[in-house]
Curated annotation (Swiss-Prot):
Main location: membrane
Biological role stated in the UniProt entry: Seems to be required for the assembly of the photosystem I complex.
Membrane-related topology note: Multi-pass membrane protein
Family from the record: Belongs to the Ycf4 family.
Swiss-Prot/TrEMBL keywords: Membrane, Photosynthesis, Thylakoid, Transmembrane, Transmembrane helix
Annotated Gene Ontology cellular component terms: photosystem I; plasma membrane-derived thylakoid membrane
Protein name according to UniProt: Photosystem I assembly protein Ycf4
Recorded name of the encoding gene: ycf4
Gene source species: Picosynechococcus sp. (strain ATCC 27264 / PCC 7002 / PR-6)
GO BP terms, alphabetized: photosynthesis
Source organism, top-level taxon: Bacteria
Keyword flag Metal-binding: no
Length: 188
């Protein structure tokens, strides 16, 4: 888990948000690429009766049904790996939260998938911010999220999606943000 570096001055507070550029995503993309290419080469070796894989000799395997299954799993693993690398390089979900007292605006910026809505950028006036709300649910699927309560809008999540952040870090982030914006902190 990478440490979150919050940039703060008297007038601007900027919190970077970690998206899909995580070590775990890179690890899974690499593992699925190695496995997918290995299965694909093993399946093609059984079809062409020629060894394309340097580690073993799968050319003696019958293509129907074992070689076809190996080829199918190889294509599936390679496509999964390509998708994971694509999401990794786009940094889907990454961005920042910026609270600027100079301009009087809150900016919530996130990267999305390629397309019409590639960049997600919400801006709200500081006067419309009502409070910071912390939601903490423990159990099998724990959830620890900070929300920005905006007038005439729904609650906007402020932290990353995925693994829940430690409770102490959530409390510190919420308190720092509430102190900076001089608004109440709810839910703790």
């Amino acid at each position: 888990m990478a440490a979150q570096v919050t940039t703060s001055t008297d007038k601007v507070l900027r919190q970077p948000i970690l998206g899909s550029r995580r070590f775990s995503n890179m690890l899974w993309a690499s593992v699925s690429a190695i496995g997918g290419i290995g299965f694909l080469l093993a399946g093609l070796s059984s079809y062409f009766h020629k060894n394309l894989l340097g580690v073993s000799d799968p050319s003696n395997i019958q293509f129907i049904p074992q070689g076809a299954a190996l080829t199918f799993y190889g294509v599936a693993g390679t496509l999964l790996s390509a998708y994971l690398w694509f999401v990794f390089f786009l940094d889907v979900g990454g961005g920042y939260n910026e609270f600027n007292k100079e301009t009087g605006k809150v900016t919530i910026f996130r990267n999305g998938f390629v397309g019409k809505n590639r960049i997600i950028n919400f801006q709200y006036p500081l006067k419309d911010i009502l409070s910071i709300r912390a939601e903490i649910k423990e159990g099998l699927n724990p959830r620890r999220v900070l929300y920005l309560r905006v007038k005439n809008r729904g609650d906007i999540p402020l932290n990353r999606v995925g693994e829940p952040i430690p409770l102490a870090e959530l409390e510190n982030q919420g308190a720092e943000l509430a102190r900076f914006l001089t608004i109440p902190l709810e839910g703790l």
